[in-house]
Amino acid sequence: MKLLVIAPCLITPFYVYRGPKEKEYIASIGVRGIISELDKEWQILSYPCPEFLLLRWPRPPMSKEVMAHLGMEKIVKDIADFIGRIITEEKPERIVFVGVKGSPTCGVFTTTSSNPEDYDYSSIQRFFYLGKEERLKSYKEIIEKGNLRIVKGSGLLFTELMERFSKLHNAQWIEIDKDNIKEGIESLREVIRETRR
């Protein structure tokens, strides 16, 4: 068996914190296209969305430090335990972990960072009640006010997953950039091809 461990927002666009924009629809269509091409040796593990478990949906943009301040670390450990149990019991010959560039939880090599003391925590409740159009108009303002920035490093979940599984000889790590979806889709497709050799 080969195992594809993938962020749920790459399969369905509706987990995206502010609600989907066109790029999320395109990304999920591309990823589902690759999944449809997998042979019977592959199994898909789309773990529970850690951000949804912590804050429900929708939520305003925030950094990994803000997520940690709100209690994300317990959820991350629970999800990593779940993934680890599957890996231990199923013993896949190949594991491909797929995350999302810039995500505070599922960023593989790139995440979002800020000082959690600068964050407007009251925006969480306000954002929840906004309609989609209002959310899409206001999320950039929250990014600016909170001084959220994209940095090198892993999101909270992928930091935990890498600590536990990066030494496995059969594990590979891919980060999908929703702003450059063609490159990410091609990287994933190439890794899948390599497993057939």
Language-model segments: residues:
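Residues lining hydrophobic/aromatic ligand-binding pockets adjacent to catalytic sites
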Residues: 2, 11-30, 46-48, 136-140, ...
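Short His-Asn-centered micro-motif
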Residues: 6-8, 100-101
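Short, well-ordered beta-to-alpha junction loops that form the rim of enzyme active sites
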Residues: 97-104, 178
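Short, surface-exposed acidic-centric catalytic microdomains
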Residues: 20-66
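Short catalytic/ligand-binding loop motif for oxyanion handling, primarily in non-cytosolic enzymes
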Residues: 13-15, 54-56, 103-109, 113, ...
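Catalytic phosphate/metal-binding cores of nucleic-acid and nucleotide-processing enzymes, i.e., regions
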Residues: 115-117
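Divalent-metal-activated hydrolytic enzyme cores
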Residues: 55-64, 69-87, 122-197
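Structural motif
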Residues: 3, 94-98
